[in-house]
Amino acid sequence: MAAAAPKRRMGLEKIGLYDVGRAIGKGNFATVRIARHRIAKTKVAVKSIDVSKLDKENLIKLEREVKIVTMIDHPHIVKCYEIMRVDNMLYIVSEYCSTGELYATLMGKGRVTEDIARKWFTETAAAVSYLHNKGIVHRDLKTENILLGKDSKIKLIDFGFSNFQTPDQLLNTWCGSPPYAAPELLLGNSYDGMKADIWSMGVLLYILVTGGFPFGSESVNDLKRSVLSGVVKIPYWVSVECADFIRKMLVLNPTKRMTIQNVLAHRWMHIRNDVKKQVQNLESSIRPTPSKLNPTIMMFMQQHGKWTEEQIIDAVLGRNFESPIFATYELLADKVKIGSLEGTGEEYPRRGSRGSILSGRANVDEQPLTPTISAHQLAQLNLSSPDCDSDDSSNSDLCDESPLSSLEPNHKQFTLPRGLDLMGNRFENRRHTLCASEQLLSPNLMGQFPPPNLLLNNFTMSPLGFPPMPEGQAAEFPFPSLHPALGAFPTTDLSKMLPVPKSERRASAGETLLPTNFDLQQHLANLSANPVSFPTVEEEGRSYLAKYGGKRNTVHCLGNQIGGGVQNPIPRYQRTPYAKAPPAERRSSWASPSLSQQQQSHLEKIFKDALQTNNDISRLHKEFKNLSHGCAQSQITNEGSSLACPQISITDEYNRQHNIAPSASSFDPVSIFQKNAQEVVFGQRPATAIGFSSTSFSGMSTPEQTTRSMDDRVRSIVCTLPFAEVVEELKSSLNILKIPFAETQEMVYEPQVTEMRRLSLPSGVEIGVAVLPPEHKSHVEFAIINNDSPTSEILCDQLICRLRMIDPNWSSE
């Protein structure tokens, strides 16, 4: 193994003060590799980009990413340490998280509980709130861009698509991942980046609590149709508060979508913690630019980095990310922050006593001219941990190209390095407790130990530590100190030692509770040689009936013919006393399967007596006959077709699957273009266990009955273009949007015979185009059948805008 270490070290690429190893991620233009700082002995992630392969637009995005990562500092955002430019390569050195992506954790463990989801989502929301307050939008929030750091803390990464945005500004660049993209991005419209981040956060929370995506699809077109439908199906195990939270973030209309302040104030976020206080604590924990540097770190850097004090102060206070001095100081400061060493505020510790209060004299010892680093402080800076290694074993981790090292980074701290013996390396798991390599005992104490006896090297020792004796002669050394070979070694009198404890131990020693080998043999010897006999199924049944047969709800007796045995085994589902009873024998609580003739005649007599008397029962009987006769006659219309009965649905999912509205039987879309109806009243949607969701046909997003005027649901426009041209333009626009429709041709007879063309959309929009005979114009009406479909309103606005663009002489009705 000693010869293998230099070989591995030769495979490390040296970039600046870093030993760069294996790749842990790849993108379109960049590669991320794990590296190790040679002075701080800390693992970092190095993102390398070949600038020569980028065009002008991507170069602008890269410089914008560098500007953003160097101006943010948050506990739940991966920290940037250094920016290096070497020839045509740009290197971004950032914090390394060994646990891996949140996506890999969810793929391995599935959905998490709402408590864990609340913790992770709160930390993500705190990071997004920090970015939005600085005028930065991420635009690529997803599980792949969220890492888990120490103690499962969220770390947000990848600011390649980030941008600056003011409150009154809209963005136009399409970016991000389609499953997390907001509907305004899928439509290609200008969008608010902060509202797009809120939509991605809603998808993220849905994935955490359900383990799947809210909009399932096999292609981008299917995804677009699923998102624009506005239907979000939430499983039953999600709480009402969480379901309401998800629906308010996944609102199609961005103006009605939540802001980051609304997200932090939602009641689901405050179930088990105070989110506002937690966010304030996170913001207060952000380390500002120090006005005075830590003298211990500065001394350590001067000894190992050969930098002067002025160079260190200028680079750190100026936050020069392109200087290795700033990165070294930040890495060492993070290590000191983890430990107990913090800046004391004084350049050197005060020495001496405070003196006498009466005399007013203070006895202060003279301070040394040259400050020194104590062993404890040096141990803090040389601290070893899974992310901060100080030995050569970390090089094997940097060079290991095995798939396990890249796919399962969280298993490294539980396994031993390759090629090391288990017993010889048993204490390596506690390397973080080792301090600096200095002499732990003073020379005075070392001088008190006797020098080693050189004569021991000339003796052939036995396994027990004593020289072999001649055959037939026993060793007669009553005390170990009388042994001739143990001259100057200190010995211990075994008679003064504590007695060996018995096998009685504390309850925490679990192995003592188990029986010994002798106890097991004695127990097996006492067992009988005869096998244990168990009762058969028939014997169990008879015993059960003998004990509980007198009860009211049990079988009275067993039949004479009982199957079973070896030849005819009883099926598993029939091994119960109730299955053994013959059909004639029943429970006492069961009703009779048939009526006797005497019982039948008695019931008929009671029925006739009740109808002969003029009482309430007879009147109800007559009214029931009349109602049933009337319903039977009116059930068939003149055309011979039966009317469809209104179906009652109890869940939103049933309504969406079968396209059933609360008033589907009484609502006629054709009447919109033939009658001047003023109001349409939709019923109250039922409350479900999933929460008060907004569906395609339910009235509002809350269980309240609402009334909307027809003017809000029907929009009309008069075009001067010919009738056929308007119809073709509408059909062409729908085909471009990839929205299916059904076309029908009808005739309107009031006030005069005119032709009308109808386009029916599955989303609940009816488009009617009719001819106005006197002016030879086209009358277009858009009717929204759904009561709360923002998608339908947006679609109607787009089609009306299209008609206005091609017809400058349009007019409203």
From Swiss-Prot:
ATP binds at residues 24-32, 47. It catalyses: L-seryl-[protein] + ATP = O-phospho-L-seryl-[protein] + ADP + H(+); L-threonyl-[protein] + ATP = O-phospho-L-threonyl-[protein] + ADP + H(+). Its cofactor is Mg(2+). Keywords: ATP-binding, Cytoplasm, Developmental protein, Kinase, Magnesium, Metal-binding, Nucleotide-binding, Nucleus, Serine/threonine-protein kinase, Transferase. Autophosphorylated. Elevated cAMP levels appears to act via PKA to directly or indirectly phosphorylate multiple sites on kin-29 and inhibit function. Residues 383-412 are annotated as: Disordered. It comes from the Eukaryota. Its main location: cytoplasm. It is found in: Cytoplasm; Nucleus. This is Serine/threonine-protein kinase kin-29. It comes from Caenorhabditis briggsae. The gene is kin-29.
